UniProtKB/Swiss-Prot annotation:
Organism: Mycoplasmopsis fermentans (strain ATCC 19989 / NBRC 14854 / NCTC 10117 / PG18)
Function: Required for rescue of stalled ribosomes mediated by trans-translation. Binds to transfer-messenger RNA (tmRNA), required for stable association of tmRNA with ribosomes. tmRNA and SmpB together mimic tRNA shape, replacing the anticodon stem-loop with SmpB. tmRNA is encoded by the ssrA gene; the 2 termini fold to resemble tRNA(Ala) and it encodes a 'tag peptide', a short internal open reading frame. During trans-translation Ala-aminoacylated tmRNA acts like a tRNA, entering the A-site of stalled ribosomes, displacing the stalled mRNA.
Classification via PANTHER family: SSRA-BINDING PROTEIN, TMRNA-BINDING COMPONENT OF TRANS-TRANSLATION TAGGING COMPLEX
Protein name: SsrA-binding protein
GO molecular function list: RNA binding
């Protein structure tokens, strides 16, 4: 699995509830752009339209002389029951959203995208998470020196 692009900044601001894998419908020049690692998932999100799920604001940089919309809406390929389950979880949670966490090549050289159902975190939650990580690092460091 070769990672094309990560959305670390986007994932930092949210608490991940669930993750899903989906295919993505791309044009030829977008695939070439992905192979050249010129994809940005910053400020991108997913939305539902007529029972289908779409990726919005993902930027595939222009490849060579092709003149097309770099941030067009791209259809995500998922099973119908997965889409329905994701939609119901989204409505059940209320203040939640779906953002892409990473885009990658799978073992068969297909471009896949990992999307995450997330809820926004407040500053206090972020601070608690940072403290928790620091404590875990400290404990690992102490245990490493003991053994």
């Amino acid at each position: 699995m070769k990672i094309i692009s990560d959305n670390k900044r986007g994932m930092h601001n949210y608490k991940v509830i669930d993750k899903y894998e989906a295919g993505i419908s791309l044009m030829g020049w977008e695939v070439k752009s992905a192979r050249a690692n010129t994809v940005s998932l910053l400020n991108s999100y997913c939305f539902f339209r007529k029972g289908e799920i779409f990726l919005c604001n993902a930027q595939f940089k222009q490849y060579m002389l092709v003149k097309c919309d770099e941030t067009r809406d791209r259809k995500l390929l998922m099973h119908k029951n997965e889409i329905v389950r994701l939609q119901s979880k989204l409505h059940k949670l209320g203040h939640a959203t779906i953002i892409p966490s990473k885009i990658y090549f799978d073992n068969r050289s297909r471009i896949k995208i990992e999307i995450a159902l997330v809820q926004g975190m407040k500053k206090t939650d972020k601070r608690e998470e940072i403290k928790k990580r620091d404590n875990e690092r400290y404990i690992k460091k102490v245990l490493k020196n003991v053994y």
